[in-house]
């Protein structure tokens, strides 16, 4: 029923005859396409990985240039963390007027979207995905389109711990990326 609900929100007819992984991929393409229309004015073509990177950069680079003076490179989560650290302080201290506060809320929403996008590995459903992977994607779609999450069953995790690594106790908390 989750995929059907998402399809209905997209104003589609539910398509339960389509193979499950193909159906999930089609919904994923539609969701990124909607965001591309919102931010670029049109849906893009090409590999999903490139489209996601393009949208993430469209969301983050203008804000990085504004708040840090230049675009950053590297993993999305540290970039998002740095932007939030730049956007929030004056809001919290009440140093912005209503118009600036509204603008910054929009910027925080854009940063959140970039982080959401980065949580979707582009090849996650390739090559006969496990039931767990399929469930993870469907649950993520549900959460990202409705802000609600239902429990759909139990998940299993296997945690393998490798050899210990030496870490300096003098960690630089202002570093842009985690040195590990």
Regions found by a protein language model. Name each.
Residues 1-180:
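Membrane-interfacial terminal anchoring regions of lipid-handling membrane enzymes
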């Amino acid at each position: 029923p989750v995929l059907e609900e998402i399809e209905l929100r997209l104003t589609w007819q539910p398509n339960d005859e389509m193979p499950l992984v193909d159906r999930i991929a089609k919904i994923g393409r539609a969701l990124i396409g909607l965001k591309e229309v919102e931010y670029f004015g049109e849906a893009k073509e090409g590999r999903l990985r490139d489209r996601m990177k393009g949208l993430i950069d469209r969301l983050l680079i203008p804000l990085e240039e504004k708040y840090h003076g230049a675009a950053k490179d590297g993993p999305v989560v540290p970039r998002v963390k740095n932007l939030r650290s730049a956007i929030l302080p004056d809001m919290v201290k009440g140093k912005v007027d209503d118009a600036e506060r509204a603008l910054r809320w929009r910027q925080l929403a854009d940063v959140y979207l970039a982080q959401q996008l980065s949580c979707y590995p582009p090849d996650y459903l390739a090559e006969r995905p496990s039931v767990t992977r399929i469930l993870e994607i469907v649950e993520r779609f549900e959460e990202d389109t409705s802000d609600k999450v239902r429990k759909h069953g139990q998940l299993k995790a296997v945690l393998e711990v490798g050899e210990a690594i030496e870490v300096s106790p003098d960690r630089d908390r202002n570093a842009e990326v985690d040195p590990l």
